[in-house]
Amino acid sequence: MTKPLLEVSACYRSFQAGEQQLTVLKDINLSIARGEMVAIVGASGSGKSTLMNILGCLDKPSKGAYFIDGQDTSQMDVDELAKLRREHFGFIFQRYHLLGDLNAVGNVEVPAVYAGKDRLERRDRAESLLSRLGLGERLDHKPNQLSGGQQQRVSVARALMNGGDVILADEPTGALDSHSGEEMMRLLQELHREGHTIIIVTHDMHVAQHADRIIEIKDGVIISDEPNLASQTAVKAQVDMSLAKPSGATRVAAWDRYAEALKMALLAMSTHRLRTFLTMLGIIIGIASVVSVVALGEGSQREILKSISSMGTNTIDIRPGLGFGDRRSARVRTLTASDANALKNLPYVDSVTPSISSSVTVRLGNKAVTASVNGVGPEFFRVRGYELAQGQFWDDDSVDALAQDAVIDDNTRKQLFPDSTGAMGSVIGQVIFLGDLPVRIIGVTKPKESAFGNSDALNVWVPYTTVSGRMVGKKYLDGITVRLDESVPSNAAEQGIITLLKMRHGTQDFFTINTDTIRQNIEKTTATMTLLISAIAVISLVVGGIGVMNIMLVSVTERTREIGVRMAVGARQSDILRQFLIEAVLVCLCGGALGVALAYLIGVVFAQAGGSFQMIYSTTSIVAAFACSTLIGVLFGFLPARNAARLDPVEALARE
């Protein structure tokens, strides 16, 4: 005796309805041979559709066994059942269940995509099947552009796409007019003659009369199973239903499934443009905030460090006392020019400048202004980064000779010589009085901008020996500034300077100010502020991610029937998971791209508005923004995608 193709043994199917258990199928025993055309007839609620779902591997018996070509399906997992549906079964639904976003060819191709067929091969087969079914002129039409009969023929072509060894037709004429219904039945009989196993589920005995065997079911029990002698169709060939068909699990096939998921994600996004944009909005704002804050922090930090550099890079200032605010500092008189000379001999010191400061009245003719007179060494201007606009600086000979030469800043020039413009030839060589001391102007410095603002103070620089010997009459210094070699760590050099001066003074009666320490503190403060504000901006990203999850849950609910159709034609759980996960990630990636664009726009507006510094965008922050948006898509898209993948195909198909 020939082994049956499909065999159901002692099958029961029960459902939980509240606190009651409803048994829909009761002790079903049924076998269907390869190449048969069988009609299962019954009234609504008889259990015929439930039996069809079990036969088509959309459902499993609650009790009993179901064998396909001798293999027990009860031992198969969901993906193995999906493989059977994909490679051996084809479904024709009463409501067609076509995917509205795809055209006729696209709908027919879907089973082949999940089977891993080559793109050109599946396109040729889809077009060939549709042409054979009389839809050669409707290949690019979407379901809403086709009549009921045409949609049903697309459904038939889809069922045949991967071979359709077993065709399960659920009320195939239920939504068609009588003429289209007759055409459909003739088509099913033709497929039967070609060797396909046809199982028709119907409530209409007239439709059942087209089959070679009629099984009648009532209240979940088979009450009749008789051959239909009036319709015995000669079968021309047998369709091969070996369970060892190639699975299509190649790398190219996997990429094709990714491409299909990406295409469907783009279609879903374009169908609901406004909703998609509003979903992205939280991501856009969050990414723009993070990128802009990092750019602002980087820009402000660079500007501040530039200002610190303008005051002298890699320098250490030495002041009397134990710190700012030390009341005893005015009585400490131990810093001397010999200390400066000793420091100059250290191997890691580039240059040294002593300093003595005093505030005096500067007079020129009948003009008198209050200015800060700074007695410094010849290398002071190099240490502090001053540049000449006119004239020259003095040298060591001027220091030794207590020369009465002065360099003034641009503010002093404007106050004393308001009419000097251009080459300023009238300034160089002019004599001004510092108190009662006449000095000759030999140079004018260029204006010096700072992120802290341009000072209005008036500065006059003369040799420190001149201030000490001719103006204030003191032998000690107000401070010493040391410029370090660029290759030396400033902290180590600072300790060396402190050690030397402690040895010379016998105690530590001075303190140091390391500009590198200031720079490090500013960098730390800026980084902390950037992190704090970015953390606040991340909240927007989290809110945006919750919005993505919410909309994806809505999308899963809206597209439940689509998910059911895809499962019916053989989609694995991983295929459904991938499709919705890609959609969530794509929404977040697009939001990330728009967020980065918005951040750049903010930078342009900031520059046009006259910001005091430029926003500096880093590649790292942009890459991190995209990585963050992708991560949000994965994290917040996983739950909806998992829910979609875990849907029961029978329930999904029944959902309106």
Curated annotation (Swiss-Prot):
The keyword Cell inner membrane applies. ATP binds at G42, A43, S44, G45, S46, G47, K48, S49. Keywords: Antibiotic resistance, ATP-binding, Cell inner membrane, Cell membrane, Membrane, Nucleotide-binding, Translocase, Transmembrane, Transmembrane helix, Transport. The keyword Ribosomal protein does not apply. The chain crosses the membrane at residues 277-297, 531-551, 586-606, 621-641. One of its GO terms (molecular function) is transmembrane transporter activity. It is a multi-pass membrane protein. GO terms for biological process: response to antibiotic. One of its GO terms (cellular component) is plasma membrane. It comes from the Bacteria. It is found in: Cell inner membrane. Residues 6-244 form the ABC transporter domain. Belongs to the ABC transporter superfamily. Macrolide exporter (TC 3.A.1.122) family. Part of the tripartite efflux system MacAB-TolC. MacB is a non-canonical ABC transporter that contains transmembrane domains (TMD), which form a pore in the inner membrane, and an ATP-binding domain (NBD), which is responsible for energy generation. Confers resistance against macrolides. Homodimer. Part of the tripartite efflux system MacAB-TolC, which is composed of an inner membrane transporter, MacB, a periplasmic membrane fusion protein, MacA, and an outer membrane component, TolC. The complex forms a large protein conduit and can translocate molecules across both the inner and outer membranes. Interacts with MacA. This is Macrolide export ATP-binding/permease protein MacB. It comes from Shewanella oneidensis (strain ATCC 700550 / JCM 31522 / CIP 106686 / LMG 19005 / NCIMB 14063 / MR-1). The gene is macB.
